[in-house]
From Swiss-Prot:
Source lineage: Bacteria, Bacillati, Actinomycetota, Actinomycetes, Kitasatosporales
A single BP term in Gene Ontology: antibiotic biosynthetic process
Keywords: Antibiotic biosynthesis, Manganese, Metal-binding, Transferase
Comment on protein domains: Instead of having the common DXD motif at the position 130-132, it contains a DTG sequence, which may provide greater metal ion binding flexibility.
Name the UniProt record assigns to this protein: Validoxylamine A glucosyltransferase
SUPFAM superfamilies: Nucleotide-diphospho-sugar transferases (SSF53448)
Organism: Streptomyces hygroscopicus subsp. limoneus
Length: 453
């Protein structure tokens, strides 16, 4: 395992990747009758683990594409299956340009599996499909079209009918068992229960993701495509993300931060076939990965992603962002220097450097005569406030665009957290969440505006 630095980013933007040995299903994949040796236009990467029957269905839909089979390839990346997955892949060698890569089962490592598949891919475009996604017959054609033309798309989020793991519809199973994907869409394509659960978010911006502040929230790799060069430019999937959930959104965050635009394609659709899920385990795993997200990208938006996901209200991240913008506007100009001084006065004398975090630091978060041996971490949800913050000559001050709902620091990292009155607005909505987080990271917490000091 090694780290890849993301150019132009500080150390948190270091992506963990592995270099596993790949094992193509044959030393040489026999060409299909009539196939040419030209480089495929698209590589479809499918991670899988012990879902041979679902994989068979996904590959079956890719074998009936309107695009000539020699123009695209399929790479199945196996996360350590013990079922007949390898045999399923072999059964498609005469119908698809297909490759297979296997990695040892060391737990849920879908990020590593996708990277392994992407390394084996040879096309300039990568598409990621989840096992169990039933591609429409024009899926490949539509992906290629979306990335072509005078203004080709960079990242394309393909729609996925039937995807709502929280509330799977009882009719979905019989529908996809009885009909091919295109007939299923013809019959119930307009039914509310059949829609991609992201549809309300896309509709709200007329499917123009440039109008979204956080399009990366909807970068879900059950159906997505992008140039291979852009995928590797940002480091691919971060393999520190193990277990279910979040690794795709974190990649979307880095793509967006690099200025790579995202679009939605309703034409390159698939249907997610229903399958068993371990919902409680998935939620627990997702929260661990949300925590990793905050530690790797310590700023307000990943913090809000963690906070709303922790409350089970994932779709409201944008709502919370707007609320914090309003609270920042209301608190602009509010000075809390006296409150910070009161908090610092509670520190006992020490010969060692003491670490102090301030939630709601404001513009002037530095005492005129700062206490010696104190390292200040000034946190505020108003990024404009932090941009105006002056640093101290000795470098003992750092600024963080965080509210305090979830911070990147380990338990008991600080000697003291000071929560100021600039947090009054957020506290009305989030209650004791800030105090709870403060007690997690510090041995002492002071809230001068609440104590009456």
């Amino acid at each position: 395992m090694e780290g890849v630095d993301i150019p132009g980013r500080p150390s948190p933007w270091r992506v963990c990747v592995t270099r596993p040995q790949v094992h193509p299903i044959n030393a040489k994949v026999a060409p299909m009758p009539g196939a040419t040796s030209h480089v495929p236009l698209l590589s479809v990467v499918i991670p899988t683990y012990n879902r041979d029957a679902l994989l068979d269905r996904t590959l079956g839909t890719l074998a009936r594409q309107t695009t000539a089979p020699e123009d695209f390839e399929v790479v199945v990346s196996d996360d350590g299956s013990t079922d007949t997955t390898r045999d399923v892949v072999r059964s498609y060698e005469d119908r698809l340009r297909i490759k297979y890569v296997f990695q040892e089962d060391l737990g849920y490592r879908v990020a590593s599996a996708r990277n392994g598949g992407a390394r084996l891919a040879s096309a300039p475009l990568l598409a990621f499909l989840d096992t169990g996604v039933l591609a429409g017959p024009q899926y490949v054609q539509s992906v290629l079209a979306a990335h072509a033309g005078p203004a080709p798309a960079k990242v394309v989020l393909g729609c996925c009918y039937g995807y709502d793991p929280r509330n799977p519809h009882p009719e979905l199973h019989s529908l996809v068992e009885e009909f091919p994907p295109e007939e299923a869409v013809r019959r119930v394509g307009d039914a509310p229960w059949f829609q991609d659960m992201r549809l309300p978010e896309f509709t709200a911006v007329d499917f123009d993701l440039s109008r979204m502040h956080m399009p990366w929230l909807w970068f879900w790799t059950l159906n997505v495509s992008l140039p291979a060069a852009d995928f590797w430019r940002v480091g691919g999937f971060d393999e520190d993300f193990t277990g279910w959930g979040g690794e795709d959104i974190e990649l979307g965050y880095r793509l967006h931060a690099h200025g790579i635009p995202m679009t939605v394609s309703r034409e390159s659709w698939g249907i997610e076939a229903p399958h068993e899920r371990t919902h409680e385990a998935n939620v627990s795993s997702l929260m661990l990965n949300c925590d990793r997200f905050v530690r790797k990208h310590p700023s307000l938006l990943p913090e809000l992603f963690w906070a709303v996901t922790n409350r089970g209200i994932f779709g409201s991240v944008e709502t919370e962002r707007l609320r914090f913008e309003e609270w920042a506007s209301q608190a602009r100009g509010q000075q809390v220097l006296d409150e910070i001084a009161i908090g610092l006065d509670t520190l006992p004398p020490s010969q060692h450097t003491q670490r102090v975090a301030v939630f709601g630091s404001g513009t002037e978060g530095l005492p005129t005569a700062p206490r010696q041996n104190v390292e200040l971490f000034l946190c505020d949800y108003d990024e404009g406030v932090l941009a105006r913050q002056e640093s101290r000559d000795d470098g003992a001050v750092s600024t963080w665009h965080l509210s305090g709902l979830r911070t990147p620091w380990p338990d008991q990292h600080f000697d003291l957290v000071i929560i100021t009155s600039r947090m009054d607005g957020p506290r009305q909505a989030w209650g004791e969440a800030f105090t709870k987080e403060a007690h997690r990271i510090a041995s002492s917490v002071v809230e001068p505006s609440l104590s009456g000091d």
